[in-house]
Amino acid sequence: MVYIGIDPGVSGGIAILDDEGSVIECVNMPDTPMEIFQFLMGYKDDSVCVLEDVGQGMPGQSSSSTARFARHNGHLEMALLALGIRTIKA
Protein backbone atom coordinates (compact mmCIF):
# COMPACT_ATOMS: atom_id res chain seq x y z
CA MET A 1 0.00 0.00 0.00
CA VAL A 2 1.17 3.50 -0.85
CA TYR A 3 -0.15 6.56 0.95
CA ILE A 4 -0.46 9.88 -0.87
CA GLY A 5 -0.78 13.07 1.16
CA ILE A 6 -1.75 16.28 -0.64
CA ASP A 7 -1.68 19.89 0.53
CA PRO A 8 -3.77 21.30 -2.34
CA GLY A 9 -2.53 24.88 -2.49
CA VAL A 10 -0.52 26.07 -5.48
CA SER A 11 2.40 26.40 -3.05
CA GLY A 12 1.47 23.06 -1.44
CA GLY A 13 2.86 19.68 -2.29
CA ILE A 14 2.45 15.94 -2.56
CA ALA A 15 4.08 13.37 -0.28
CA ILE A 16 4.23 9.64 -0.97
CA LEU A 17 4.73 7.22 1.94
CA ASP A 18 5.11 3.46 2.08
CA ASP A 19 3.43 1.01 4.48
CA GLU A 20 5.94 1.76 7.21
CA GLY A 21 5.60 5.55 6.93
CA SER A 22 8.90 6.06 5.13
CA VAL A 23 8.94 8.85 2.56
CA ILE A 24 9.17 7.56 -0.99
CA GLU A 25 8.89 10.96 -2.63
CA CYS A 26 7.96 14.49 -1.65
CA VAL A 27 7.46 17.18 -4.31
CA ASN A 28 6.23 20.72 -4.67
CA MET A 29 2.80 20.95 -6.27
CA PRO A 30 3.09 20.29 -10.01
CA ASP A 31 2.30 23.36 -12.12
CA THR A 32 -0.31 22.08 -14.56
CA PRO A 33 -3.26 19.67 -14.44
CA MET A 34 -1.41 17.29 -16.80
CA GLU A 35 1.70 17.32 -14.61
CA ILE A 36 -0.47 16.52 -11.57
CA PHE A 37 -2.11 13.64 -13.47
CA GLN A 38 1.21 12.27 -14.74
CA PHE A 39 2.81 12.39 -11.29
CA LEU A 40 -0.11 10.63 -9.60
CA MET A 41 -0.28 8.03 -12.39
CA GLY A 42 2.95 6.54 -11.05
CA TYR A 43 1.22 5.77 -7.75
CA LYS A 44 -2.27 4.71 -8.84
CA ASP A 45 -1.92 1.01 -7.98
CA ASP A 46 -2.66 -0.09 -4.40
CA SER A 47 -2.80 3.44 -2.99
CA VAL A 48 -4.99 5.71 -0.94
CA CYS A 49 -4.87 9.50 -0.85
CA VAL A 50 -5.51 11.90 2.00
CA LEU A 51 -6.43 15.27 0.51
CA GLU A 52 -6.51 18.25 2.85
CA ASP A 53 -10.09 19.51 2.92
CA VAL A 54 -9.84 23.25 2.56
CA GLY A 55 -13.43 24.42 2.64
CA GLN A 56 -12.95 28.07 1.79
CA GLY A 57 -10.47 30.65 0.60
CA MET A 58 -8.10 32.44 2.90
CA PRO A 59 -9.42 35.56 4.64
CA GLY A 60 -8.50 38.67 2.69
CA GLN A 61 -8.03 36.86 -0.63
CA SER A 62 -9.69 38.28 -3.71
CA SER A 63 -12.53 36.40 -5.34
CA SER A 64 -10.32 35.66 -8.36
CA SER A 65 -7.68 34.14 -6.07
CA THR A 66 -10.32 32.01 -4.35
CA ALA A 67 -11.65 30.89 -7.75
CA ARG A 68 -8.12 29.98 -8.89
CA PHE A 69 -7.65 27.87 -5.75
CA ALA A 70 -11.00 26.13 -6.25
CA ARG A 71 -10.14 25.34 -9.88
CA HIS A 72 -6.74 23.94 -8.85
CA ASN A 73 -8.38 21.80 -6.15
CA GLY A 74 -10.82 20.52 -8.78
CA HIS A 75 -7.90 19.50 -10.99
CA LEU A 76 -6.49 17.46 -8.11
CA GLU A 77 -9.82 15.78 -7.38
CA MET A 78 -10.42 14.94 -11.04
CA ALA A 79 -6.92 13.46 -11.47
CA LEU A 80 -7.48 11.25 -8.42
CA LEU A 81 -10.93 10.23 -9.68
CA ALA A 82 -9.70 9.49 -13.22
CA LEU A 83 -6.89 7.31 -11.85
CA GLY A 84 -9.22 5.46 -9.49
CA ILE A 85 -7.23 6.48 -6.40
CA ARG A 86 -9.38 6.18 -3.28
CA THR A 87 -9.44 9.60 -1.62
CA ILE A 88 -10.18 10.68 1.93
CA LYS A 89 -10.69 14.37 2.66
CA ALA A 90 -9.33 15.36 6.04
Tell me the role of every PLM-derived stretch.
Residues 1-90:
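Phosphate- and other anionic-substrate recognition elements at nucleic-acid/protein interfaces
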